[in-house]
Every structure is written in structure tokens, then in C-alpha cells.
Amino acid sequence: REMPSGAAPRVLAVQDTTPKPAVSFGAFIDTYFAWDFGQPDAFHRPYTTQPARHDEFNVNLAFIEARLAGEKIRGRVALQAGTSVQANYAGEPSIGSVSGDDLARIIQEAWVGVRVSPKVWVDGGIYFSPIGWESFISWDNPTYTRSLLADYTPYFVTGAKVTWAASPKVTAQLHVVNGWQIVSENNPDKSFIARVEWQATAALALAYAFYAGNEQLDTLPARTRYYNQLLAKVAAGHGWDFWGTFDVGVQTVPDASSQTWYGVVAIGRKALSKKVAVVGRVEGHSDRDQVLILTGTPDGFRTIGGSIGVDVQPEEFVKWRTELRGFSSSDPVWPDQGAPTESELGGFIVTSL
């Protein structure tokens, strides 16, 4: 039928069916009491950040968060406080007038991401480290405290990443970051992280992570760090889960030699019921050259350890966790109840709600 003269053509309204991004809010509090058998001076526990204090009630980690989740955009902003936060941001660089831990430690994460293709995301900001299985958030970990291996790899990084879902079973990431657990830069160089995850079967997951970057201040000769990590997780059935991690790092030094460290940890967890679980861990960490752990002793930090724990979850959003943990080192590096010399043995018990 002919359109009447002067009549405007009809336009069909096309409705956008893309769901709007959802915004959600959350909060978390992890309180604890820890007793270190070495009874360190000034209530400060050495060499681990969780728990960081001895013989006092305190907050390990508390945060509030806002999340954005959509088909094409995503993000998270979280503000935090706690003794683990103070311990982990103590090494934050303060170069210039707007850097340092005063601001950096308040921000747990602040990042935003966009989906650039059906299988590729690009994210940028401050975000949790892609190295390792163990989270900053104790609730998400099989053991209450992080292993030595995890404590001496980054909790967080600052930069940008590309995530590619290569297949339903394989995911790969590439990160460009400021450095090894820092928010502000300490030199003009950028560092790189790669991670590949493979869900081999419904019960077996494997991952590999690699890091490379200069970790020295701009005023000093470069020290390039190369780090490799292998991870495995097994859901064995009947309430059993197992985690295994091995890492090795090499750092160059100005005289053309290198320094090496390595670590290993194995964790097993058994769910006795829907509300009760037990967990055990064995671990070893060797940093003779004191790249990550400065002891000032001849053999550096060469330590084996273990822990046992009990988790009770009376309500959906409540966990009561208790853990007994011990260490044995080649050198006397642990507090010894106020004695003038330190001990090769260390340990503590911690309970958390």
C-alpha cells in the first residue's frame, strides 16, 4: 500500500535485550587470637603474616566490597583493614608525594574489566595475584593460615591482564604489572606474569604460573626475578580434597651470579560432615640466599613445617577455625621465650571466627 503524501515512515523500535550489569555488595570479618610458643617480644610474630600478632585478640582481615557483573563489563572495589594488611603492605614503595602504604593498604582491589570478544576479557587496576591457589581471604582457603610458599608470593598486583578461555577446560592469562606485590612503581621497568589453567578431568585441575621482572629500586643495579610455579588440585571423593604446589625462583645479582629459592606444600582436607572438616599440611621452604626472607644467619631461611586444623561451620556465613602449626629450621630464627638466642623450632596455635 502506498504511504500517504507527507507521512513519516514508521520506525520499528528494536529493544535491547542485553541484561544490565548487576551490582552487589558484601562484607567480611576475620577475627582471631593467636599464641606463639616462642612468646616474641612486642607481640609481633615473625615470618608469617597470618596471624601477625601474639597473645592478643585482633582482626586479621576485614573488608567491604562492591561488585559489578555483566555480560560485557565487570569489576570490584573493596576497602580493607587488619593485621595481615599492615604486614603485607609494609614493603610498599614510597617514591614521590603520592605513593606509599598509607593509601595503598586501604585498597584491597579496585579493577574494572571489559569483554572484547566472546572468549577474551581485558581487566586493569589493583587485583588479587594470579600466582598460587591460596587467597588473601582466609575463608576461601583449605587451611586458616597461608603456607610459607604462599606468604612469600604476591597477595596482590597492580596492572592489566588479558584472560582467554581457550576451551571449556583451558584458560590462559597474561599480565603486565608494576612489580612483585606493589601498588606504586619502584623503577621504570614493568613485570610480566603468565598463567595457564587446565581442568584435566572433573576431579583434577592443574596450573602453571611464571613471573619475570626487575625488583630493584631505580637507584640500584637491576636484579631480575624469574619465578615458576606448578599447582595441582584433586577432588578425590568421599569428602577428600588435596592441593599440591611447587615453586622455584631465581634472581640475578650485579656480579653476574644468581640467587635461588624454592618451596613445596601439600594439603589434605577431609569433610567429616556438612559442618565439620579437618585439614593437614606439610611444607618446606628454602631461601638460603635470603632473597625473600632476611634472617641474617649463615643458612638463611631453610624450614620445614606442618599444621593440623579443625573447621566448624555452624551457619552458612560463619566459620570457627582452629589451627596448630609448627616449624623446624636449619638456623635459629624463631623467638625462644625471651632468651638471648633464638631457636630452630617455632610454632603457634590460632583460633579464628
PLM regions: where:
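Outer-membrane beta-barrel "beta-signal"
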Residues: 312-314, 318, 341-353
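Repeated loop/turn-to-beta-strand initiation elements of outer-membrane beta-barrel proteins
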Residues: 72-75, 119-122, 169-174, 202-208, ...
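Surface-exposed coil loops of outer-membrane beta-barrel proteins
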Residues: 36-58, 85-109, 116-199, 207-215, ...
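Residue-level signature of outer-membrane beta-barrel architecture
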Residues: 66-70, 114-116, 164, 198-200, ...
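N-terminal periplasmic/intermembrane-space "pro-region" immediately following the signal or transit peptide
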Residues: 1-47
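Outer membrane beta-barrel transmembrane domains
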Residues: 210-217, 250, 255-258, 269-271, ...
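Surface-exposed beta-loop-beta
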Residues: 182-261
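Transmembrane beta-barrel strands of outer-membrane/channel proteins
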Residues: 27-35, 77-81, 124-126, 174-178, ...
